[in-house]
Amino acid sequence: MNSSNNLYALENPEIENAFFFRQALNAISTPGKIFDLSCNLNTPNGLSKSAGSLLLCLCDFDTPIFLSETFNTDEIRKWITFHTNSNFTEKGNCKFALGNWEELLPFEKYQLGTDAYPDRSATLIINYEKISNNGTKLFGPGIKNYTYFNLPDEEKFKNNNSL
């Protein structure tokens, strides 16, 4: 574990999980804004506190998860199973996918959802070290005026929008 050898991820689960959930909602509703999830979350080696907090507050026994090769370790699988009771699956059947950018491609392998049921699409939790507010200009719903965000591959995002 990163912070300690304690199996339990949170010291105050109700309060900390509410904080994570609020931060996740803020991030989803304001695309391109960077949120700091500083916390005392105990995660296994290789799993960031940000990714771990998202998994804890968004996944449960009814949430199939895909783990890319880097994250598909016994330690990470056991931690996710212990805290969420989620099961693991392939890209095409997951509700959440965790991985590095290149390992999660291509986007076409994931469930897309529809206009009527957008919740049926997969959510990708991308481990990306070089996050910053410069690069591609973003605008649209949830963004006042515009913002900038360094996307790993702008063309892949544009192509994904047309799926």
What are these regions (language model features)?
Residues 74-163:
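Internal, well-folded beta-alpha domain core
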Residues 1-64, 68-71, 82:
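N-terminal, charge-rich interaction modules
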